[in-house]
Regions:
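Amphipathic alpha-helical segment used for protein-protein interaction
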Residues: 1-20
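Short amphipathic alpha helix immediately N-terminal
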Residues: 17-32
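Short alpha-helical "recognition helix" segments of helix-turn-helix
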Residues: 38-40
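Residues in the helix-turn-helix
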Residues: 49
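Residues within the DNA-recognition helix of helix-turn-helix
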Residues: 53-56
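Short, Lys/Arg-enriched C-terminal cap helix and immediately downstream tail that follows
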Residues: 58-65
Length: 65
């Protein structure tokens, strides 16, 4: 079973949760349950950028587990 260190987890939290740009996208996508297209419209980003943020966030979390 792979292990993670606290620095890796804090880096993920700092990058995706503390940063307001990413926090808004992640909240709209995972808390509010909006589609990528709806999140892009509300946040003012392209759909591809929203997909990229969500994919990178999930990959970081998966890599830590």
């Amino acid at each position: 079973m792979p292990t993670y260190n606290r620095y890796d987890m804090s880096r993920v939290i700092e990058t995706y949760v503390v940063n307001p740009k990413y926090r808004q996208v992640l909240q709209l996508r995972y808390v509010e349950g909006l589609t990528h297209e709806q999140v892009a419209e509300v946040a003012g980003y392209s759909t591809q950028h929203v997909k990229s943020i969500c994919k990178n966030y999930k990959n970081y979390l998966i890599s830590l587990l």
